[in-house]
Amino acid sequence: MESSGPSSCHSAARRPLHSAQAVDVASASSFRAFEILHLHLDLRAEFGPPGPGPGSRGLNGKATLELRCLLPEGASELRLDSHSCLEVMAATLLRGQPGDQQQLTEPVPFHTQPFSHYGQALCVVFPKPCCAAERFRLELTYRVGEGPGVCWLAPEQTAGKKKPFVYTQGQAVLNRAFFPCFDTPAVKCTYSALVEVPDGFTAVMSASTWERRGPNKFFFQMSQPIPSYLIALAIGDLASAEVGPRSRVWAEPCLIEAAKEEYNGVIEEFLATGEKLFGPYVWGRYDLLFMPPSFPFGGMENPCLTFVTPCLLAGDRSLADVIIHEISHSWFGNLVTNANWGEFWLNEGFTMYAQRRISTILFGAAYTCLEAATGRALLRQHMDVSGEENPLNKLRVKIEPGVDPDDTYNETPYEKGYCFVSYLAHLVGDQEQFDKFLKAYVDEFKFQSILAEDFLEFYLEYFPELKKKGVDSIPGFEFNRWLNTPGWPPYLPDLSPGDSLMKPAEELAELWAASEPDMQAIEAVAISTWKTYQLVYFLDKILQKSPLPPGNVKKLGETYPKISNAQNAELRLRWGQIILKNDHQEEFWKVKDFLQSQGKQKYTLPLYHAMMGGSEMARTLAKETFSATASQLHSNVVNYVQQILAPKGS
């Protein structure tokens, strides 16, 4: 289908956005009354014992916010997002231009106000109201110790077991527990930071510039505007190695060789393919930081420096799609951002689509369809557990005041979002035209935060012939239905190119489900050549058919040590689920072993669900495993596991 091309819908002035009026019930801040222009952090990290009291671990220093008043009538107070774990000691207002003789510096009163269980408001009162369009700086002296935004790890929670480690995790609303801010994805600013660390430690941040300033100080600058949730810091015993012209890996010294081996030369190929499809990579560097094993996520797309789980060091480059996913966020999420967390699908649905476009070009359609089929299976699993009509199974989630956006996290924005973007590509009917559209979309909305309306209006402007046809209101596929009706996606992309890989896996699973497995037929299937996702797909089918007839799981494990003794986390997760679903108690230790080796939420929670849904022995295993590993898990993951072990109202 011929496109009108970007020229006809591109005006020199930026279009007015629906998102300019969007509310964010998860922020206590006055982000519509002030524009944040720049943030500077000046922090000193201290590793001591946990808890309050002198000498305890914490970050001490200052946050300086450069702001401009947007209200025509001026303003007499400013509200920032903060948290009870932040102790603000002083607030100073700097009026006039920096370096100006007339610059006024005055201490200003401040107080906190309750907001929700995940944050509070920090209210700064101006002695003299600021005028419309006035620029000023606010300097806050503060300290943060224990809290949800800054994660302190004892040496035993790291890979090297020798030195402590600290990192921050901002998404979704945790950076208010790192520094006072407008903690909403609706607004963006540049930032800089000066971080002082103890001897023998290195600091890294999500910034385009990294400089050593003396033995223990590091300076960072992010020259592109980003939302607060993407500002990230990590401090530990870190080494680095170059793996491409604009990429290096960072990791603890004991992991650096494995990290280099796994990713040397491959990242540039992913980046270059992304640029061909979606336009220039604007962030300068793309580095990877391999986190300690307790890191709860697969990856966090902090710009310039993606934080990733060490589970990706599979030794065979088989989990590189996670890196492709995080790289895809460089365009979708980091450059064009959801304006509030109810629109999370704009970040994740597009990123899944982009990841699978890159993967199709590099690894072929069969492999990508197979990977997408495992994603679809996860969505099916989620909807079976939560109920299709659950309001969280809409693309646009209504987040109620007081609800932590993190608690709405599930597969829907990823996989149903992917289906919606695929449906829009299907309406266009020409992959090349849709790729061009995505490039134009990124260019149109770069460095901005948007709502679904902004995107869909642009789509219909770009393809006027589709607008004329009324594709937004085709019965059963209405855009409004996609966004606001819970349940299974109305359209599923065709994954049949993956049949050549899926069919053999389905047939093999069928053989293992027989009460008397035909070992001759089973041994005729050479799984030694299968890629990881083919094995994952096979295990998903085995799990669906479980419990298998008695003795079959034991035999399956003996037949395929490649699966039952795998080091690959995706295989270990599914083997653990199969062990539990079949109550194969002699291998229960493998579940505990896996949960002790890492703390990724995506692997941890399903195994606790499986243990608590299993036999008495399995439930005992859950409690024993949790008491052995709780101290090494992220606080959010601890809370979720506790809810599985003792559901509210039980």
Curated annotation (Swiss-Prot):
Protein known as: Aminopeptidase B
Gene name of this polypeptide: Rnpep
Biological processes, Gene Ontology terms: negative regulation of blood pressure; protein processing; proteolysis; retina development in camera-type eye
PROSITE patterns according to UniProt: ZINC_PROTEASE (PS00142)
ATP-binding among keywords: no
Residues bound to substrate: 298-302
Active-site residue numbers: 326 (proton acceptor)
Site keyed Transition state stabilizer: positions: 414
